[in-house]
Design a protein with these regions (language model features):
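A broadly structural signal marking compact, well-ordered functional cores
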Residues: 78-83, 87, 106, 115, ...
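Aromatic/hydrophobic pocket-lining residues that form the small-molecule binding cavity
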Residues: 72-76, 109, 113, 137
């Protein structure tokens, strides 16, 4: 069983045998949950108390450190803070879009979502991140865990799910 501590707040979730639970052991329906695309400033169709995947496009977040979209990331943080008020919880799904990173761009893709994680680190409604299939999973998890050890990681990949601490979605 994997239990994690949030840096600035109490842990809300734990992962066990590819399932997500609240800290009191109540199952959370992560597998098959709805996924929506982040759109800061827009009202998203989520119900109070819902758990969902929130897709964040690489182009929206910024493709490299010279082009991180701080306006988008600030809007994303504001949207996540609104989710907190409605007890909506999400995990971030990094999306490469039609521009899957070539191996030379993989580091930039990971760095972009590491930067995204820094910008939303105080959002209690974020349970963690999905591990993108287009990058080295161990590297992605290691990079995000270095400063954000409280995140739980999610995947649909059977190979990654061999680690019972990764949650199936």
């Amino acid at each position: 069983m994997l239990e994690v501590d949030f840096m600035k707040f109490e842990a809300k979730f734990k992962a066990e045998k590819n399932k997500l639970y609240t800290m009191d052991g109540t199952p959370v329906a992560a597998e098959g949950c709805r996924t929506i695309t982040a759109c800061p400033g827009a009202a998203l169709d989520l119900n109070d108390g819902e758990f969902a995947g929130l897709c964040v496009n690489w182009n929206d977040a910024g493709r490299d450190e010279d082009s991180y979209n701080e306006e988008f990331l600030a809007g994303l943080r504001d949207q996540l803070k609104e989710f907190e008020e409605r007890h909506i919880f999400v995990f971030i799904i990094p999306v490469a879009g039609s521009n899957e990173p070539a191996s030379a761009e993989e580091d930039a893709f990971i760095a972009s979502f590491k930067h995204c994680a820094r910008r939303i680190k105080d959002c209690e409604c974020v349970a963690g991140f999905a591990v993108p299939e287009c990058v080295d999973a161990a590297c992605f998890i290691s990079e995000l865990s270095a400063k954000h050890g409280h995140y739980i990681f999610f995947s649909k990949s059977d190979a990654l799910l061999a680690d019972g601490g990764i949650v199936r979605y």
